[in-house]
């Protein structure tokens, strides 16, 4: 305790000296800020759900708002117009990433796609990953895996429906997304994999996301190593390293398995491709891969891929279960389109259900998987809504707040897919009131695959089954309480009773 108090005193003392030296009239017309405390700035105003805290602060301060996290200024964007200026008008000037402690560790020194600062190396890595995994041709090819895994889920749910017990749909949909991504990336079924513990993988993914988005004193008090000392005393470094080692052990087992010449595989997966490139590359090749690069890529593919699919399906089914008439309407569209005797849903069926697509859009609006886009950092001075944002400043775009802006959406807290009837707004990065995948150079490269998983998953759930609340509950008892930082999960798992439709 004495050491912690001494550390806090030293941070405060050095910080106050730093502030006094920095006080001067700024030449910039900076965005407005809410009142701050000495040393900590606005950190005391950030709750367990930062996107909600930022929305409340923006309502009082402005949609372009300057916060201070310790000694680090952060601009928070909460309007469509400001988001368009950041992500389109000034995209090239602010498309790099800040170098944060958690993201540096999990990305193995920025050897991934998501957290690597902008530059030639990042462009080459992204180009490679899109070509080998996320381009339209690859997504179409991997469609058979999505179909097969959805079919397996239908069979399991059909077996569960015999006695009509409630099913943990949150876990079932997580496993569906994980099974698809593991087969695509690793060439093996999630359930049959000998080195993956099904009961612990969701915990590892949640821990990894928390590590990537965690607030550390090292990030916000970068003065004389005192922030690092505070993290060491609090156990933050130990926890981050523990998450890293667990994730690293998983990916090392994957790589070792792929290095076995006798391994059976049903297709050449992305790990095979990356290992081939690594073994055959020349010193003059524009793309240089090491084992750390491969592990960094796998972190992006698995973590982001599973979340996009699983969480979107969970939130969509949550909202439909809370609105029985709405569920009946979307099921009516699907069953009228497909008839009563369809045995299997395929990717060719995706363009036959426009109302389901509206349900997905509305889910993205009300429950974006990433409520705050990954932080950007300005490389040069820019102006947003008339305010100056100097170089080396972090920017957060609050897509969750934009999706609930009453100036853009009528009754924004209401789940109403019909708002998208005759509405051209789409989620592919060109309409800045709906940004589940971001926009510009940093738009999510796996958007196409993620959408395919969501569409086919929901189609199977809604065509083959009716859904009821568990005994003792009604649809009004199903809540939407959130948890998480980098991504937002349903805090209480969604449990529903499947009724197989004959």
From Swiss-Prot:
One GO location term (cellular component): membrane
Entries under Pfam families matching the protein: p450
Binding site for heme: 444
Enzyme class: oxidoreductase
Domain of life: Eukaryota
E.C. number(s) listed in UniProt: 1.14.-.-
Keyword terms, alphabetized: Heme, Iron, Membrane, Metal-binding, Monooxygenase, Oxidoreductase, Transmembrane, Transmembrane helix
Membrane association type: Single-pass membrane protein
Cofactor(s) needed by this chain: heme
Matching InterPro entries: Cyt_P450 (IPR001128), Cyt_P450_CS (IPR017972), Cyt_P450_E_grp-I (IPR002401), Cyt_P450_sf (IPR036396), Cytochrome_P450_71 (IPR050193)
One MF annotation (Gene Ontology) recorded for this entry: heme binding
Residue ranges crossing the lipid bilayer per the database entry: 1-21
Compartments in which it is found: Membrane
Similarity comment text for this entry: Belongs to the cytochrome P450 family.
Protein name: Cytochrome P450 71B16
Organism in which the protein naturally occurs: Arabidopsis thaliana
